[in-house]
Amino acid sequence: MVHFSDSLSRLLAELQKLPGVGEKTALRLAFHLLKSPDNAAALADSLRDVMSRVRFCSVCFGITEDDPCRFCSDARDDGAICVVEEPQDLLAVERTRAFRGRYHVLQGALSPLNGVTPDRLRVAELMKRLEGGGVREVVIATNFTVEGEATALYLARMIKPLGVRVTRLAHGIPLGSDLEFVDAATVQRALEGRSEL
């Protein structure tokens, strides 16, 4: 086993806390930073800057430097709210330019086995926004995972009694895919969600 200095060991440990970074990748990144002190200093400055300036929007809980964020302060359709799990999901929907309403970031998805219950998410804040009136439709854009589906069903059950239309993103076969290579569950969902031509 190789022993590193305390400072290098600490850097390796911190890098491994990042998603998708294992021991080998952490080591490669650490040595790259050691060989490029200017890049390392710029990275450290950038991290300090983003940690001091970026925060969660008090309305939608996306990330922002200004509160409320531009998605909450721009002229948009106040009658539609797209609910996503994470801030990066908000950006993925926004990149399509297909949705012109408001957003709400849950900060996760229901996962009782991992201790993530509705009170650990931004569900209460969503319900408060809806109870304020004026919202016609909530588009649930949670991930198509067990947790995302459970979250979507839970939210639909909570929202429908308010008289607000609840819709879910369509899912199915990706563009450019050959049907023979798509799994059966995806084909089944695509068949169930088929639309008129």
From Swiss-Prot:
NCBIfam families: recR (TIGR00615)
SMART domains in alphabetical order: HhH1 (SM00278), TOPRIM (SM00493)
Underlying gene: recR
Assigned keywords, A-Z: DNA damage, DNA recombination, DNA repair, Metal-binding, Zinc, Zinc-finger
Protein name: Recombination protein RecR
Pfam families with a match to the protein in the record: RecR_C, RecR_HhH, RecR_ZnF, Toprim_4
GO molecular function: DNA binding; zinc ion binding
Domain called Toprim: residue spans: 79-174
Coiled coil: none
Gene Ontology biological process terms in this record: double-strand break repair; recombinational repair
Zinc finger (C4-type): 57-72
